[in-house]
């Protein structure tokens, strides 16, 4: 359990809060590129409790500014998009991508008043289908060389979804390796097609889908280690006397996780506060072996949401589609075949902000407790001007933040620690875009242990 004050620290992310300051010190997803129309690429965005407007400039760059005009407070998401920025409809004030006012047409011709007027403006950068924004102080850090950023676009796919709960609930679900044995279990054979469906591929060398394997072996040995990107999490299941199943996942500090999607596929997923009671998850899926079938992936995911807000069709208002008969005959949850809905139910059912003073954590929660300690330490460091984890200060440091390694594999019991790394190295050697020249901090690390967990 947490102290009430610590829970408040971890869940409050608006302007001026310690954890909000931590999140603002990193690049955060602001929108999917596909959300902005070619005809008028302007979109209202609420991010970390701030109301903003995202727009694409004629030169291809991006601007992110306060949603409200400094003059009389009207909504700039309806502004005219011009070559130099956004022009307010009310009195014609023009703002550039940095939020600086450039023109005030109704003021006297000789007036320089516009030079004194500025609204909030934040740097933006586009990476593999997502527009990222930096809301922190000073210059933004360089982007790390993580796989999700360096993979060629044709090998990636990006999407998002709205969850009606605090951001930390979503993130903690993603770094909890034991829930998959229950929440995502099928009572009989998994009926889903493999492509694009998490846990539906066969685990290489077993002939068994991952959903069945983790369901049959529901008591993994969980180990957590510190890593340059945050945390590395091992869930090791004993299949036979001589063979283990090894699943390696990651916390990408401060608010993302990286998990294997199949034998050649991985995804990185951020949990980004809209405000303290709502957040979006953003995903970049990438394939080491072949270009993605983006049309299929998009069709699968659009079938479960309503636009333009990416609100899941299964939600609290309809009990997440709960079907008692299905729960008896097909799925552990009774909430359909989409694993993302299962995760959504788990974290939304806790309420808008989970009361962590009332929870009881066990050994299987090692990754959750390690992450909370890391976040609280970072909040303290932010307030005292200390160093934040996994935040590169220069390009050399950013280039050293690679991977992270995320893999599902079977391994000899005695040598699993080395075997999974060999398996990952082979996957990269065979990859068209992450070949044998790949190297980085991910190959080194502390031996997995339990000291950072519960």
Task: Tell me the role of every PLM-derived stretch.
Residues 24, 118, 125-127, 265, ...:
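A short, structural micro-pattern
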Residues 12, 32, 80, 184-189:
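A short, aromatic/hydrophobic, helix- or strand-capping loop or linear motif
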Residues 16, 32-157, 241-244, 271, ...:
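Rieske [2Fe-2S] iron-sulfur-binding domain
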Residues 15, 61, 132, 138-438, ...:
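C-terminal catalytic domain of Rieske-type non-heme iron oxygenases
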Residues 26-28, 48-50, 120, 229, ...:
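Short beta-strand or tight-loop elements
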Residues 1-27, 31:
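A boundary/linker detector
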Residues 2-4, 18, 101-113, 298-313:
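Short, charge-rich amphipathic segments
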């Amino acid at each position: 359990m947490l102290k009430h004050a610590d829970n408040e620290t971890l869940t409050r992310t608006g302007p001026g809060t310690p954890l909000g300051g931590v999140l603002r010190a990193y690049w955060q997803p602001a929108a999917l590129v596909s959300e902005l129309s070619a005809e008028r690429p302007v979109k209202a965005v609420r991010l970390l409790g701030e109301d903003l407007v995202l727009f694409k400039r004629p030169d291809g760059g991006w601007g992110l500014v306060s949603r409200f005009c400094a003059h009389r407070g009207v909504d700039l998401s309806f502004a005219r998009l011009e070559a130099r920025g956004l022009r307010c409809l009310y009195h014609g004030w023009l703002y550039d991508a940095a939020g600086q006012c450039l023109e005030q047409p109704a003021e006297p011709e000789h007036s320089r008043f516009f030079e004194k007027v500025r609204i909030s403006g934040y740097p933006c950068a586009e990476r593999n289908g997502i527009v990222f924004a930096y809301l922190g102080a000073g210059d933004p850090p360089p982007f790390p060389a993580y796989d999700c950023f360096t993979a060629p676009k044709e090998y990636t796919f990006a999407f998002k979804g709205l969850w009606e709960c605090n951001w930390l609930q979503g993130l903690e679900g993603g770094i909890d390796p034991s829930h998959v044995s229950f929440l995502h279990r099928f009572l009989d054979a998994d009926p889903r097609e493999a492509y694009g469906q998490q846990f539906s591929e066969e685990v290489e060398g077993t002939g068994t889908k991952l959903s069945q394997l983790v369901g049959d072996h529901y008591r993994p040995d969980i180990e957590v280690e510190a890593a340059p990107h945050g945390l590395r999490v091992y869930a090791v299941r004993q299949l036979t006397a001589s063979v283990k199943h090894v699943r390696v996942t990651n916390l990408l500090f401060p608010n993302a996780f990286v998990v294997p999607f199949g034998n050649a596929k991985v995804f990185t997923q951020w949990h980004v506060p809209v405000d303290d009671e709502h957040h979006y998850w953003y995903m970049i899926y990438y394939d080491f072996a072949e270009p993605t079938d983006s049309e299929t992936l998009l069709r699968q995911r659009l079938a479960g949401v309503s636009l333009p807000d990416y609100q899941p069709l299964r939600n609290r208002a309809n009990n997440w589609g709960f079907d008692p008969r299905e729960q008896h005959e097909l799925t552990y949850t009774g909430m359909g075949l989409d694993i993302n809905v299962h995760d959504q139910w788990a974290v939304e059912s806790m309420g808008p902000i989970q009361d962590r003073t009332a929870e009881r954590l066990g050994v299987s929660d090692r990754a959750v407790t390690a992450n909370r300690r890391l976040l609280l330490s970072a909040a303290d460091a932010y307030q005292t001007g200390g160093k934040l984890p996994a935040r590169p200060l220069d390009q050399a440091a950013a280039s050293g933040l690679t991977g992270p390694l995320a893999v599902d594999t079977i391994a000899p019991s005695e040598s699993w620690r080395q075997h999974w790394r060999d398996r990952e190295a082979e996957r990269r050697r065979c990859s068209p875009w992450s070949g044998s020249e790949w190297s980085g901090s991910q190959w080194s690390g502390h031996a997995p242990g339990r000291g950072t967990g519960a």
